[in-house]
Every structure is written in C-alpha cells, then in structure tokens.
Design a protein with these regions (language model features):
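Flexible, low-complexity junctional segments that flank or bridge functional domains
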Residues: 14-263
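Bacterial Sec-dependent N-terminal signal peptides
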Residues: 1-16, 29
Length: 263
C-alpha cells in the first residue's frame, strides 16, 4: 500500500506551485512505486511503457503551471493504470477547497448497482431508488470513466469510488466536462417505477442546512467480536459485523487449558 504524503500538499488546492517542485515530487513517487509495488508495470503494458508515461507526465508537470488539485488529478490518472485500489494519492482536504460545491446526496453500493441512501426531505419518497443513468449516461459508462481517473482494482472499487466522490463538483466535472450547475439522475424506485431527480450544486453551508432523509443503515461500528443489525423495517435485510476471525484450534486449546471467557 502506497499513499504518499508530499510536503507541498499543505498548500491550498488552487495555489500555483513551482513546476520543478511538482516534477520532483512525481519523480520521487515513481521511484517509490517501482521499488515497493508488487507489480508496477503490467497495468501500463510493461516496464518500458510505465517509464514512458512517467517521463511524459514529469515533463508536463515541469513546464505547465499547476496547483495541488491539478497535480492530484493528473497523478491519479497515472496511478489508475495500476488497477490497484490500495495505491493512490489522498485528495485535497475540504478546507483546501474553499470554493468546492456539493450535492445534497448520499449514495451506497448494492450488488450490481447504486441506490439513494440520503436525499433532501422533499424527495424522501425516492429513498432506496436504484440509479440507472447519470446525466443521461449509463452507469457502466460512468463507472468506466471513474476507473480512468481513480485507482480501482475491481468493479466493487469502481462503485465505491463513485459513491464516495459523486457528491463533489470537481469529480463530477471530470466525469461530465459539459455539466451545468445541477446533476440529473434517472431512477428505478423500489416499486419498479421510473422517476427522475435533478439536484443543484450547493455550497458546503447550504448542504449542511438542507434537511435530509436517510435510509436505515449500520448505526455505528462496534467493538464486539460479532454483531448484527436489521436495516429495514420488515427485518428482511441484515448487516453482520465481524471484527476478526480466529482459528478454531486457538479456542479448543484454551478450552482444554481450562481458560474461561473465551467468547
């Protein structure tokens, strides 16, 4: 797992940064990647192509004025070739993205899909609806674009990255360069009806002031070895939380030794 924290990243997301410094940081990343990653080359088509892409990006960073945000975007695209969800850059923090806008929206992954987990109270009848298209594009198309800009090693990673980043304006504009100031979702409701939902981009404060309605979900992490919780009112869907799995032999040995409080 490689999650580099480079010194310049304390700067504002939009503060212009020295090109030589950006190139130097990226060169360091490439060196560490080649030295520590179990397979840094295959996703690029081989060692030669890995270094070829690294060379071009380093030169681009050196000659083109950039910010923390543009550095993050370009290097994330480079790292996405690894198809490794454990190797990525941490994005700029919210405090460093003063002008960032958001959707009043929370989504979550289900098997082969994404559903609405939290939305403004005005649309609470749409909670739990499955997203079928985003701004007119199929979920498959959007997932493919997500994989091209954020490292993901499998389909679940793509879903997770999309769910985590979808409420942020910067990510949405990477997916939809022609996007206006709102996002349109085509939905399939739990009772099988086709509906649409258009949400505007809002400031962080506006999102915080928006009354939201949420689906039931796992309420909190627990320190119990094994715990479960129903997430629907009919008690048909359960979440199970297992903190760790111990070998049976360990318990049998301790039991034979007369030790108590094993569970």
């Amino acid at each position: 797992s490689l999650r580099p924290c480079l010194a310049y990243l304390l700067a504002s997301a939009q503060e212009p940064l020295n090109g030589d410094s950006l190139a130097s940081d990226f060169r360091y990343l490439v060196k560490e990647l080649a030295a520590t990653h179990p397979d840094p080359y295959s996703g690029f088509g081989g060692k030669v192509f890995f270094y070829e892409q690294a060379f071009h990006l380093e030169n681009e960073l050196r000659r083109t004025p950039g910010t923390k945000q543009t550095f993050f975007d370009k290097v994330s695209i480079f790292l996405s070739n690894l198809q490794d969800g454990h190797t990525y850059l941490l994005p700029p923090t919210a405090n460093q993205q003063a002008n960032q806008r958001y959707l009043a929206l929370e989504v979550r992954t289900i098997p082969d899909g994404i559903i609405l987990q939290g939305i403004p109270e005005t649309y609470k009848d749409l909670l739990g609806s499955r997203i079928t298209t985003i701004n007119g594009d199929s979920l498959e198309e959007v997932l493919a674009r997500t994989a091209a800009i954020q490292a993901s090693e499998n389909l679940y990673d793509r879903y997770a990255n999309l769910c985590r980043s979808m409420p942020t304006e910067h990510f949405l504009r990477q997916l939809f360069p022609e996007m206006k100031d709102n996002l349109h979702l085509s939905l399939l409701t739990p009772d099988g009806k086709s509906r649409g939902l258009t949400l505007p981009l809002l400031s962080r404060q506006e999102v915080q002031n928006t009354p939201m309605q949420h689906n039931n979900s796992w309420k909190a992490y627990t320190d119990k070895q094994l715990a479960y919780q129903f997430i629907d009112n009919d008690k048909q869907i359960m979440l199970i939380n297992i903190n760790s799995i111990m070998a049976r032999d360990n318990f049998e040995y301790m039991q034979k030794q007369g030790l108590k409080d094993l569970y």
